[in-house]
A protein has these predicted regions:
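Conserved catalytic cores of very large enzyme subunits
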Residues: 2-413, 434, 438-594
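Contiguous, well-ordered alpha-helical segments that form the cores/surfaces of helical PPI scaffolds
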Residues: 135, 417-430, 450
């Protein structure tokens, strides 16, 4: 209960919580009860689906081979969403509760948007994305200063009577500041945690493919030139603002169209992105060869079901996300599979406690079929659990418990039931493989991913669709590791958690190009239809030319989703921030610094 032990609570590390006051405590103290209630409701819908199913099997699965994400949240809460903002223009946020007016100018738009973001976040477990935010902001900028406002950012918009003079550009920056700092504030409806917020950015061809048929309520259409100027200004502004304050949100994703040769269709945007990376900016780049999917979160890629515009409610392809996430503990599953053999102990190295198969064993069809069938049997239960959770959510929706869905911000049937993967590296290591660019590891990865994707397609219904992702698993990766270690399973000794990447993040012998290949279509990208972010950790920033080479290489090999991580450093005395590590503050000389 002490206020200084926030880090020991069950709070997301990315939630901007620094101390635990009574508001945080009130949310945390009920999590055990929430989990029990959530489990009881979930189990009741499983029994409705299959009255003969032994519910003890589900309970055991969730204690061993499966991990239900955020199970201590409220009953029936969706996991994450990418919401349409169109109902925002038609009905304001009154349908979500409270009183408000329809935004009529840029000032009211930015103010009510913050309320919208907090209201949407209060109904879900995880992230809320508003991919259209900057396009809508541009709409109100044009209503304020004309369609060519972006050509005259230095024009003064205040009179001589004003003490502080403002230009179009400085006023826009002020609205950037208002929105950005607001979404980084704590939210009472989320246990005093910030709403996990995501913004999307688009190149010219992705923008036209996504919003080509879009029409605002007044009959006007989005403008690429002004929106492009605005989104670039915001991304550049955010990079500079992060030198003043460590801003967690928004998580930014830039969507670009490429061809199969690895060429970016919008070269101007390509050069801009690489220049921003070279200046130390931090965001994800999403590469696609068609406008058939959208990345709206730090972890998810979701197929766009129908990219046509509905003038009645504004529905368009950006509405997506996950309803629920259940992650497979692959390391334990693979060891359990081997334990089904009567002579499995004969294949265990007594020194390492790892499997001692010949290095080429994975290429044998009988082994592949054995793993495939074992995973399929587990997946049958996973789909039962996911169907049941989907039934629970539809029950909640039928009883009008989801204000955001009733108001048209999101469509329940367009979201996914996600099957996560964790412990991939460790499963491969247990079987004697090296997690690098080799034929055996590639065969293993494709076997796992293709098996799940094949079953996802088989189990799709009109109201339930599935995808697969290599989950970040911030807390799950530690919990699964500790659980397996305590139960006597083999776990690695060089780390105390299960990796979230296809490569081993602590492997210093694997090159950056091989890391990209491991997240390419050759290994996984085509099978992981729910996404797998390739986090490329660098010790220092690269040049624009170097980033251009790497992004072209990603596009060529089919690495769809990546970002570059270089540690920022902050002085704990004067709060000077730099986009590279330092041991001594260059401003005040203090050695009390934090990465």
């Amino acid at each position: 209960v002490k206020s200084d032990n926030t880090a020991n609570a069950t709070i997301d590390d990315n939630s901007n919580v620094g101390t635990k006051g009574i508001g945080v405590l009130n949310a945390e103290i009920h999590k055990v009860d929430n989990k029990l209630t959530n489990t009881e409701w979930w189990e009741s819908f499983v029994k409705k689906r299959d009255p003969n199913f032994n519910i003890k099997v589900m309970r055991n699965d969730f204690k061993t081979i499966l991990y239900p994400h955020d199970s201590s949240s409220q009953v029936g809460e969706p996991y994450c969403m990418a919401a349409s903002m169109y109902p925002f223009l038609l009905y304001r946020i009154e349908k979500l509760g409270g009183k408000s007016a329809v935004p009529k100018n840029l000032d009211s738009f930015c103010g009510i948007y913050v309320n919208l973001n907090f209201a949407l976040a209060s109904e879900i477990k995880g992230a809320v994305a508003t991919p259209e935010f900057l396009m809508y902001m541009d709409y109100f900028c044009r209503k304020e200063w004309g369609n060519n406002y972006y050509l005259k950012p230095s024009v003064r918009i205040t009179t001589d009577y004003c003490i502080k003079q403002k230009t179009i550009g400085s006023q826009i920056d002020q609205y950037f500041q208002q929105v950005t700092y607001s979404i980084n504030q704590i939210a009472g409806a989320r246990g005093m945690q910030s709403p996990f917020t995501n913004f999307s950015f688009f190149d010219k061809y992705f923008f036209e493919g996504m919003f080509g048929e879009f029409v605002f309520p007044d009959g006007t259409k989005p403008e690429w030139n002004s929106t492009n100027w605005l989104q670039r200004r915001y991304l550049h502004w955010l990079n500079q603002e992060r030198l003043k304050c460590i801003l967690t949100f928004p998580v930014c994703s830039y969507a670009c169209l490429t061809d199969k040769e690895g060429n970016f269709k919008d070269l101007d945007t390509f050069h801009f992105i690489c220049n921003e990376y070279a200046q130390g900016n931090s965001f994800f780049t999403y590469l696609s060869r068609s406008v058939d999917s959208l990345s709206s979160c730090c972890r998810l890629q979701n197929a766009v079901q129908e990219n046509t515009f509905n003038t009645t409610n504004g529905q368009i392809g950006i509405m997506t996300g996950s309803k629920n996430v259940i992650t497979l503990n692959l390391n334990r599953i693979i060891q359990d599979w081997q334990h089904t053999w009567s002579d499995y102990k004969d294949h265990i190295d007594v020194n390492t406690n790892k499997c001692c198969f010949p290095v080429d064993w994975i290429t044998h069809k009988d082994f592949q079929e054995g793993i495939k069938k074992y995973i399929e049997n587990i997946l049958e239960r996973v789909y039962l659990y996911q169907y049941a959770y989907n039934d629970l959510m539809h029950w909640c929706k039928d009883h009008h418990l989801y204000a955001a869905y009733d108001a048209g911000f999101i469509n329940l049937d367009k979201q996914y039931l996600t099957i996560g993967i964790n412990g991939l590296n460790q499963a491969a290591e247990y079987l004697g493989m090296e997690c690098n660019n080799n034929i055996y590891y590639k065969t293993f990865c494709r076997l796992i991913f293709s098996t799940i994707k094949e079953q996802n397609k088989k189990h799709k219904t009109k109201t339930a669709q599935f995808n697969t992702e290599q989950v970040p698993a911030e807390s799950a990766s530690v919990k699964l590791y500790n659980r397996d270690k305590a139960d006597g399973y083999w776990v690695p000794t060089d780390t105390n958690l299960y990796a979230s990447y296809i490569f081993k993040p602590n492997d210093t012998h694997i090159s950056i190009l091989d890391k990209i290949i491991l997240h390419s279509s050759e290994f996984a990208a085509d099978e992981l239809d729910g996404g797998s972010a390739c986090h490329l950790n660098l010790s220092e920033h690269l040049s624009q030319k170097q980033y251009e080479y790497l992004l072209k290489f990603m596009a060529k090999v089919g690495c769809k989703y990546a970002t570059f991580n270089i540690p920022n450093c902050e002085c704990e005395e004067c709060h000077f921030i730099a986009k590279q590590p330092f041991s001594k503050c260059p401003k005040c000389g203090s050695t009390h610094v934090s990465l």
